[in-house]
Curated annotation (Swiss-Prot):
Pfam families: YbjQ_1. PANTHER family: UPF0145 PROTEIN SCO3412, UPF0145 PROTEIN YBJQ. InterPro entries: UPF0145_dom_sf, UPF0145_YbjQ-like. Signal peptide: none annotated. Belongs to the UPF0145 family. This is UPF0145 protein Ta0182.
């Protein structure tokens, strides 16, 4: 399991950004294949969720996130902020999933600042 922190916010509570590496991404392209497209096409006639595509896209999203974490580790980042996803179709049988964000190096905040919480 990776120690890279991944968040969709601009900061991480309790951490301070000490270095910004820049934008990084993890990409995967998936194809359902002829048999899967045929089954999904038949299911789409009846309406409702097409579970074959849902699983494929969920797996692709997880792969893109794993590749994003790996890209962060390779450049020495220990966190990725502003994580986002994008997808696009390539032709009629392939889908590209991209996970991207800003790779940063963070450290714990050790200031003697008293934090006031909301109650």
């Amino acid at each position: 399991m990776s120690d890279v922190i991944m968040v969709n916010t601009e900061y991480i509570p309790g951490k301070r950004i000490v270095k910004v590496f820049g934008t990084i991404w993890g990409i995967t392209v998936r194809s359902r294949g002829l048999g899967g497209n045929l089954v999904a096409g038949l299911r789409s006639l009846a309406g409702g969720e097409i579970k074959e595509y849902t699983k494929m896209l969920s797996d692709a999203r997880n792969t893109a996130m794993e590749r994003l974490q790996s890209a962060a580790e390779q450049i020495g980042a220990n966190a990725v902020i502003n994580v986002r996803f994008d997808s696009s179709d390539i032709g009629q049988v392939m889908t590209e999933i991209v996970a991207y964000g800003t790779a940063v190096l963070v450290e714990d905040v050790t200031d003697n600042i008293q934090r006031v919480g909301l109650s």
